[in-house]
UniProtKB/Swiss-Prot annotation:
The lineage of its organism: Bacteria, Bacillati, Bacillota, Bacilli, Lactobacillales. Belongs to the RNA methyltransferase RlmH family. It comes from Streptococcus gordonii (strain Challis / ATCC 35105 / BCRC 15272 / CH1 / DL1 / V288). SUPFAM superfamilies: alpha/beta knot. This is Ribosomal RNA large subunit methyltransferase H. S-adenosyl-L-methionine binds at residues 76, 108, 127-132. PANTHER family: METHYLTRANSFERASE, RIBOSOMAL RNA LARGE SUBUNIT METHYLTRANSFERASE H. Its EC number is 2.1.1.177. GO terms for cellular component: cytoplasm. Homodimer.
Length: 159
């Protein structure tokens, strides 16, 4: 199995890079992890709704170019389903059982994601109604993926 994160924007903060590297290392016991950072479009300060849609469309095209047909795709979106960690672990396990060898998580940029990206999702998932920086969301997601694998192992990590 391979876990792939497709994200918009470059990670700059050292503490986030270190945290993600730590969880990538921990996850390497269970799965291969690939992180793809895509360039984000520059958004004018007072962008019109049309300009925002054009930006989302361009970013969406770049995202979808990194997603293969055979991948189980989980898109992080505020309107998605919310799960406790145990259920999230089961979602990952079930995708593998159903024959998906790769699970791809998609995190959009500051404007979110295009409708086409959301339509490609096998699952829309939300971490709640809070607004979080998309860079921080990468770290939170990596921890939850690690937690999911630890739950599958019956580890005391999840307590």
């Amino acid at each position: 199995m391979k876990i792939k994160l497709v994200t918009v924007g470059k990670l700059k903060e050292k503490y986030l890079k270190e945290g993600i590297a730590e969880y990538s290392k921990r996850l390497s016991r269970f799965t291969k992890v690939e992180i793809i950072e895509l360039a984000d479009e520059k958004t004018p300060d007072k962008a019109s709704p049309l300009e925002n849609q054009q930006i989302l469309s361009k970013e969406g095209e770049r995202i979808l170019s990194k997603v293969l047909d055979r991948e189980f795709v989980i898109v992080l979106a505020i309107e998605g389903q919310q799960f406790p960690s145990e259920k999230f672990s089961k979602v990952i396990e079930d995708a593998s059982v159903r024959g998906f060898s790769d699970i791809t998580f998609i995190i959009g940029g500051s404007l979110g994601l295009s409708a086409k990206v959301k339509e490609r999702a096998n699952l829309l998932m939300s971490f709640g109604q809070l607004t979080l920086p998309h860079q921080l969301m990468r770290l939170v997601l990596m921890e939850q993926i690690y937690r999911a694998f630890m739950i599958q192992q019956g580890s005391p990590y999840h307590k």
